[in-house]
Amino acid sequence: MYLNNNIFYSGDKMKKEFFKINNIPAVLWGETSEKIIIAVHGNMSHKENVPIKILAETGSQKNYQILSFDLPEHGERKNEKTLCKVQECVKELSLIIEYAKLHWKEIYIFGNSIGAYFSLLAFKNENISNAFFLSPVVDMERIIKNMMLWFDVSEEKLEKEKTILTPIGQNLYWDYYSYVKENPITSWNISTYILYGEKDNLCEKNIVMNFAEKFNCNILISNGSEHWFHTENDLKILKNWFEKIL
């Protein structure tokens, strides 16, 4: 079910269409094109965040449209009952790309942080022209195990309690952890470009570099940047990167 809501032009004259894809709030940026970039935001973010806006501004100049949407518990969906668990997000990304296949000839993807991880799972067998990843999570099991170590949570305890709230506000879920362990990233045949911050304290450099080497990705390391690209210099680097790879 695809529901159209409204179309308007933002202050920078960019066309934005707000609608829903199977009740998932979405935004389509830019003028009609045969090329679409599906943009998957990161944790604690939303479908109109700054990296996606920069992507839309840059991409529209090169004849791309951008399709972004809110993950569960994010943006317009903060009060929904659906949780932002990996298994739910993979299902939703599958719905999004099926919609894209109906409307565009060339499909590209942009994934930010955990959005890249969900993309790796959901799109691995899809016909994607290129993937663009910013601060990508490529080994979720490692990140969850690190959190369990930090907060003294054993596998046995997590299995028994099913859900554990951590001091940083992030829940640990047994079913999430189990899904991650059962679905490692073992194949990825899509031409991929990565922008990674040298000071990223969430995604360890050696893990990202090993991923890039294993799957023959083009990687650019931003020396002064952290996991969250947000400073004026970070965003300038991001914009320049988009201009170069699109």
Which residues does each predicted region cover?
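Conserved alpha/beta-hydrolase
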Residues: A56-K78
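N-terminal cap/lid segment of alpha/beta-hydrolase-fold proteins
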Residues: L3-T32
